[in-house]
Amino acid sequence: NKLKPSQWISL
């Protein structure tokens, strides 16, 4: 799935 900014910030 495509990551949203709210998801990739967790990296």
UniProtKB/Swiss-Prot annotation:
This is Ovary-derived ACE interactive factor. Substrate for angiotensin converting enzyme (ACE) in vitro. The keyword Repeat does not apply. It comes from Sarcophaga bullata. To the N-terminal part of insect vitellogenins. ACE hydrolyzes Neb-ODAIF by sequentially cleaving off two C-terminal dipeptides. GO terms for molecular function: peptidase inhibitor activity. Keywords: Metalloenzyme inhibitor, Metalloprotease inhibitor, Protease inhibitor. It comes from the Eukaryota.
